[in-house]
Amino acid sequence: GIENLTWTPEVLFAGNTIRNNRARGTLFSTPKKTVVEDNLFDHTSGTAILLCGDCNGWFETGACRDVTIRRNRFINALTNMFQFTNAIISIYPEIPNLKDQQKYFHGGKDGGIVIEDNEFDTFDAPILYAKSVDGLIFRNNVIKTNTEFKPFHWNKNRFLLERVTNVKISE
């Protein structure tokens, strides 16, 4: 696929309340700087934050290279199953043949995607799913488990990573 990089935006998504959305809370897909901070993700039906990109189905833009997700609060996100709902935060490019992929899709540098200082208040296990990432940091986040809903998700892992390198995970 071809992407016009001169038409891609930088994104500052800050101070919002995202509540009761169907399918997902937010979707970001730009190679420029993306900052998601100080938001409340409250009962988003699908994944709260999706970093996507593909030339296979939706034909959305390409890779995310510089993403910071910080100081957000996630309350019982992922209460339903839709496309791209592998975790509360899903880094999920559409790659039909992952094992033969030559380059990583997202990131591309140490700390290309940083998830820090967030609070997850959740009834189920999956917090982060990442596929085809070079440079992922998850640090200083608080994960609290509640009993508001019965856990149901097929993904029983806090962190599920597929073809990810240069990863640092610490709660």
Describe the function of each predicted region.
Residues 1-171:
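Extracellular parallel beta-helix/beta-solenoid repeat domains
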